């Protein structure tokens, strides 16, 4: 294997409308909805930074200015917190502030699909491999999924995707990969199928919204015809790229919550709250009481 090029940059698409969360997302971007006390998009940024990413490219759209503000300095707020003696909160805000020049924003002017959103980052990524994190998919575990992708990428190079296992009967809901030869940090991908027909999935490993892709994907996406939903689909582009470059998959050892769905969003809030040292115990007691009360009502019905 040739020496792999360092992955320094990550793309985070944040241009979606969040219609599944209306009316909450009428004025607030879905990426700014909170899991406990930080917005969904912050989890993706933290995961990327923990994996060694140096520069993050947000692909945004109109009415998303609040995302830029979130990752900017807030001197008035810091001054107010300082006068109140809230040094712990100041430290937390300063820790999440990106270094100057390490965050860029570009626009996706029309909602033409994930593949098109990725293509919109081409000039800011340049001729480099890059990570791609879908912020709706929130990693929960001892380490983020991208860190594991980095391990696999340094082992095999090429293109790398994050996967998890679903129940076989649910494979038709996801993008599924076929499992090939096993390597230390994952396995080779033999095929990729978007939402296969029932009983036709090559495995039960589904794509969990984390990728490391080579820059050749941009030229493919530039000329790709529209696919499902009349949109430019990333999976279609990856299928074309797989004809000339290798793909490997890293099975994530944690769990990914789909926070683009109401169920996944609620589950993520409960999971992250339970894991918190400051509120975990009391949340556990509250959730347990609610579950027991709910079960009692069901039995009494």
From Swiss-Prot:
Disulfide-linked positions: none
Pathway: Carbohydrate metabolism; nucleotide-sugar metabolism
InterPro entries: GalU_uridylyltTrfase_bac/arc (IPR005771), NTP_transferase_dom (IPR005835), Nucleotide-diphossugar_trans (IPR029044)
The reaction(s) this protein catalyses: alpha-D-glucose 1-phosphate + UTP + H(+) = UDP-alpha-D-glucose + diphosphate
UniProt-listed Gene3D superfamilies: Spore Coat Polysaccharide Biosynthesis Protein SpsA, Chain A (3.90.550.10)
Keywords: Exopolysaccharide synthesis, Nucleotidyltransferase, Plasmid, Transferase
Keyword Nucleotidyltransferase: yes
Pfam family, one: NTP_transferase
Record-level Gene Ontology MF annotations: UTP:glucose-1-phosphate uridylyltransferase activity
BP GO terms, sorted: polysaccharide biosynthetic process; UDP-alpha-D-glucose metabolic process
Keyword Hydrolase: no
Enzyme Commission number, as recorded: 2.7.7.9
PANTHER family hit by this protein: UTP--GLUCOSE-1-PHOSPHATE URIDYLYLTRANSFERASE
Protein name, as recorded: UTP--glucose-1-phosphate uridylyltransferase
The species this protein was found in: Rhizobium meliloti (strain 1021) (Ensifer meliloti)
């Amino acid at each position: 294997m040739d020496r792999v090029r360092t992955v320094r940059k990550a793309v985070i698409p944040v241009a979606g409308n969040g219609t599944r969360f209306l009316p909450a997302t009428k004025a607030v971007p879905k990426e700014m909805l909170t899991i406990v006390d930080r917005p969904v998009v912050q989890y993706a940024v933290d995961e990327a930074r923990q994996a060694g990413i140096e520069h993050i490219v947000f692909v945004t759209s109109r009415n998303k200015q609040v995302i830029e503000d979130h990752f900017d300095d807030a001197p008035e707020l810091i001054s107010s917190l300082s006068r109140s003696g809230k040094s712990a909160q100041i430290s937390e805000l300063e820790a999440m502030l990106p270094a100057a020049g390490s965050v860029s924003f570009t626009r996706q002017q029309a909602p033409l699909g994930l593949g098109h959103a990725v293509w919109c980052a081409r000039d800011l990524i340049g001729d480099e491999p890059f990570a791609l994190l879908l912020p709706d998919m929130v990693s929960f575990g001892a380490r983020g999924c991208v860190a594991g992708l980095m391990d696999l990428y340094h082992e095999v190079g090429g293109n790398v995707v994050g996967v998890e296992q679903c129940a076989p009967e649910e494979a038709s809901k996801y993008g599924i990969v076929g499992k090939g030869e096993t390597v230390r940090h994952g396995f080779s991908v033999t095929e990729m199928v978007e939402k296969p027909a029932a009983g036709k999935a090559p495995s039960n490993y589904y794509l969990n919204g984390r990728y490391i892709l080579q820059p050749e994907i941009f030229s493919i996406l530039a000329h790709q015809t529209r696919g499902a939903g009349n949109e430019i689909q990333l999976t279609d582009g990856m299928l074309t790229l797989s004809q000339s470059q290798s793909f490997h998959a890293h099975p994530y050892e944690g769990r990914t919550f789909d926070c683009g769905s109401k169920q996944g969003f609620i589950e993520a809030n409960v999971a992250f709250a339970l894991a918190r040292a400051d509120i975990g115990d009391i949340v556990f007691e509250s959730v347990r009481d609610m579950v027991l009360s709910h079960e009692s009502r069901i039995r009494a019905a």
